[in-house]
Design a protein with these regions (language model features):
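Single conserved hydrophobic/aromatic residue that forms the stacking wall/gate
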Residues: 128-139
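Active-site nucleophile and cofactor-binding loops and adjacent substrate-binding regions
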Residues: 79-80, 106-109
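Active-site acidic carboxylates
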Residues: 1-81, 91, 96, 100
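Short Gly/Thr/Asp-enriched flexible loops that form oxyanion-binding sites at enzyme active sites
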Residues: 113-123
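Short beta-strand-loop elements within alpha/beta enzyme cores
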Residues: 100-106
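Short secondary-structure boundary segments
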Residues: 45-46, 106-107, 131
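Structural motif
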Residues: 84-88
Length: 140
């Protein structure tokens, strides 16, 4: 089992999220529990490309401090909605580990979470979408 934490980056984890405090609390608890149970926590970050302010090297790209990965935890970068596009390397990583069970939480339920869950099923993974700690941000 792996806990996949999708797009919980500084640039979109803020008060624009519905029930922000509850979302933060739920994600923290989920990550803490996974770690305590020996479940690997894997992070996926979205990169909009150079010059967008939401790319590798930009502060907004970094994972929200309340959910910060441990130095030993894996991070993958995606440039499209699905975390399982070949470029991210996530699918290959899970395949090498022979890991088929994935819990998913994070941001942009209607886009990145949905695309990741659908693609995961298409690749033969067993996915659990944890609905409470996912949100859709009102980005303007």
């Amino acid at each position: 089992m792996v806990l996949l934490v999708v797009d919980t980056q500084k640039g979109i984890v803020d008060e624009r999220l519905y029930a922000f405090e509850k979302f933060v609390s739920n994600i923290k608890e989920l990550i803490r529990t996974a770690r305590e149970q020996g479940i690997e926590v894997v992070y996926v970050q979205h990169d909009d490309g150079p010059g967008t302010g939401f790319s590798i090297g930009d502060d907004e790209f970094e994972v929200y401090s309340g959910f910060a990965p441990l130095l030993t935890e894996k991070r993958f970068v995606k440039t499209v909605c699905s975390a399982f596009k070949k470029e991210s390397g996530l699918l290959e990583y899970l395949t090498e580990k022979d890991e088929k069970d994935v819990m998913v939480c994070g941001i942009m339920t209607d886009f990145c979470i949905n695309a990741t869950v659908e693609a995961g099923f298409e690749h033969g993974l067993s996915l659990i979408h944890i609905s409470e700690p996912t949100r859709h941000a009102q980005i303007s």
